[in-house]
Amino acid sequence: MTSRLFALIPCAGTGSRSGAAMPKQYRTVAGRDMLHYSLAAFDACSEFAQTLVVIAPDDAHFDGRRFGGLRFAVRRSGGASRQASVLNGLHALAEFGARDDDWVLVHDAARPGITPALIRTLIGALKDDPVGGIMALPVADTLKRIDATSSDGRIARTEARDGLWQAQTPQMFRIGMLREAILRAQADGHDLTDEASAIEWLGHAPKLVQGSLRNFKVTYPEDFDLAEAILSRPAAAS
């Protein structure tokens, strides 16, 4: 049987660094909730069997009516960390018939610049890969490591950027492998910040697929203006 595709959007974070009065995934950007753009991108890819959004059990901001017409399901099973929310989401996908050998694409709700074209680029590059992989960009800036003993932000040294890539999402792995990887990381006392880290912890080497600058993560207050500018352009609908 052909492996199917599922999308998982962990959406239980508070977005404390964004300075917003509500979780940043619900803040309005270019006329819509930030979460809408990710849902719309996956909805435009008819090859997905289901898109699942995992929100916090006590989330009072989510309103499904704001995403009318888009295909997705919601589960209030968010955990205390991203890793916990993703694991709970993987368990929930079984309700929709997901099998261990099916693919899951995990995507940050705070990356509204994702497009159907980027999603399909990732799928095309990884559908026959034995491990899976992630969207990423080569590091372009010079990297400085701060002196941990300095109280005023002094540079300790410059880090070589050769071979360094900045991880993005979606991150695409087999459901069974990713679940096993997260459970192993948890058992070893690690709370990892992305899915690729868990797969690496299991001893595998995920593949990097070049992404796009537009698919950046909205993190700080000034990022909202950049997201607004990108998403207001006609290309954002492609």
From Swiss-Prot:
It comes from the Bacteria. Pathway: Isoprenoid biosynthesis; isopentenyl diphosphate biosynthesis via DXP pathway; isopentenyl diphosphate from 1-deoxy-D-xylulose 5-phosphate: step 2/6. CDD domains: CDP-ME_synthetase. It is an enzyme of class 2 (transferase). The record marks R17, K24 as: Transition state stabilizer. The keyword Nucleotidyltransferase applies. One of its GO terms (biological process) is isopentenyl diphosphate biosynthetic process, methylerythritol 4-phosphate pathway. One of its GO terms (molecular function) is 2-C-methyl-D-erythritol 4-phosphate cytidylyltransferase activity. The keyword Transferase applies. Pfam families: IspD. InterPro entries: IspD (IPR001228), IspD/TarI (IPR034683), IspD/TarI_cytidylyltransf_bact (IPR050088), ISPD_synthase_CS (IPR018294), Nucleotide-diphossugar_trans (IPR029044). The record marks R161, K217 as: Positions MEP for the nucleophilic attack. It catalyses: 2-C-methyl-D-erythritol 4-phosphate + CTP + H(+) = 4-CDP-2-C-methyl-D-erythritol + diphosphate. Keywords: Isoprene biosynthesis, Nucleotidyltransferase, Transferase. Its EC number is 2.7.7.60. Catalyzes the formation of 4-diphosphocytidyl-2-C-methyl-D-erythritol from CTP and 2-C-methyl-D-erythritol 4-phosphate (MEP). Belongs to the IspD/TarI cytidylyltransferase family. IspD subfamily. This is 2-C-methyl-D-erythritol 4-phosphate cytidylyltransferase. It comes from Paraburkholderia phytofirmans (strain DSM 17436 / LMG 22146 / PsJN) (Burkholderia phytofirmans).
